């Protein structure tokens, strides 16, 4: 059983049990309709005193966990965090949290998760902490990554919400693990002579949809057939999930003059040990022939080599797509060979770029 007087202090927060003195704050939270308090929290103010007296402590009394308030330096309850599903015999527990809507995007969740997991390993014999998050909850995925957890897998449709089933990502942190976050590429904003390369986002869905549905894109790339707005939205979410896993990052290339969507460019298949990656892109139909794709690829390559210290960048283009091959060659890529049947049975020309190739 966890101690009744758990107290974890982080640089900006104090994690401590809820108590009767929290009644005014909790009543205000309940009245506001904010949903971040632990499971079983009252939905009407009349239930607040009883919940603070007993309900919120039932988990600790069961021996399976503990609910804690996240209090800031002024004593405001900015969130809640807890341990649950604790198996003392197996040495495992799970952490869950919620942050008040008015205090989100300030790093409180990551700070609290890091603080509580450090406390677990320092004061108990537990050896593993789990964290689960819906696959489409990008904010929670980022919290887990920043808190040093390892992405271990996806449980399909394991979470049931009001809008239906959701896939659930399982993260784990072991006592012996390092606490530094896994390496990922930042969602950096880059500029070239004519383009702004910014992280791919929902605002790029119309441009992505038109580009992905274009006949030439359909013929020369591996995008889904009959590309739709739903495919574009899924692509945006998938690319951010890949970034959080350390597998890649994606940009929208837009004109500096006017902001029109010109291309999507992404890095994928990152090998952190050897410092290699692959680049891919789709050019908007209206932007073809203007050199935008090559300009964007070269700008990203410079950043990847000079700032991130990678050593090799691969680009593959369909044998039947001479325009894409010209993009690679104008950007300084060197042709290495042909990967037979690599894209739906079609051959791909393999190019590579290393730092010494940069023009």
Q: What does each model-identified segment do?
A:
Residues 34-54, 68, 216-238, 249-251:
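Conserved GNAT-fold acetyl-CoA-binding loop/helix
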Residues 29, 51, 55, 116, ...:
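A ubiquitous structural signal for well-ordered alpha-helices
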Residues 1-36, 67-220, 250-359:
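Acyl-donor (CoA/ACP) binding surface of acyl/acetyltransferases
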Residues 58-63, 149, 241-246:
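Short loop/turn motifs at secondary-structure junctions and domain boundaries
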Residues 2, 54-58, 183-186, 238-240:
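Short, P/G- and charge-enriched loop/turn segments at secondary-structure junctions
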């Amino acid at each position: 059983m966890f101690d009744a007087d758990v107290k974890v202090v982080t640089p900006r927060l104090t994690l401590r049990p809820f108590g009767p003195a929290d009644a005014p704050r909790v009543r205000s939270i309940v009245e506001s309709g904010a949903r971040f308090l632990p499971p079983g929290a009252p939905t009407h103010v009349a239930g607040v005193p009883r919940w603070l007296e007993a309900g919120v402590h039932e988990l600790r009394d069961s021996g399976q966990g503990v609910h804690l308030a996240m209090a800031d330096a002024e004593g405001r309850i900015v969130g809640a965090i807890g341990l649950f599903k604790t198996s003392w015999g197996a040495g495992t527990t799970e952490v869950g949290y919620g942050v008040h809507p008015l205090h989100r995007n300030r790093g409180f969740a990551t700070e609290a998760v890091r603080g509580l997991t450090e406390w677990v390993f320092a004061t108990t014999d537990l050896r593993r902490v789990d964290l689960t998050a819906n696959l489409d909850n990008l904010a929670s995925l980022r919290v887990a990554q920043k808190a040093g957890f390892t992405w271990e897998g996806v449980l399909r449709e394991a979470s049931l919400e009001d809008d239906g089933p959701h896939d659930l990502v399982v993260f784990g942190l072991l006592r012996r693990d390092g606490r530094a976050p896994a390496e990922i590429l930042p969602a950096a904003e880059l500029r070239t002579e004519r383009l702004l390369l910014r992280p791919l986002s929902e605002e790029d869905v119309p441009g992505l949809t038109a580009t992905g549905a274009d006949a030439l894109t359909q013929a020369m790339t591996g995008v889904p057939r009959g590309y739709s707005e739903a495919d574009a939205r899924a692509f945006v979410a998938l690319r951010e999930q890949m970034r959080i896993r350390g597998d890649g990052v994606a940009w929208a290339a837009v004109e500096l003059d006017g902001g029109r969507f010109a291309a999507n460019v992404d890095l994928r298949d990152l090998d952190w040990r050897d410092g290699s990656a692959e680049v891919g892109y789709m050019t908007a139909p209206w932007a073809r022939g203007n050199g935008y794709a090559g300009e964007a690829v070269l700008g990203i390559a410079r950043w990847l080599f000079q700032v991130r210290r990678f050593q090799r960048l691969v680009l593959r283009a369909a044998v039947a797509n001479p325009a894409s091959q010209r993009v690679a060659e104008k950007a300084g890529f060197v042709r290495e060979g042909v990967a037979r049947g690599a894209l739906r049975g079609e051959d791909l020309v393999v190019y590579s770029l290393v730092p010494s190739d940069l023009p």
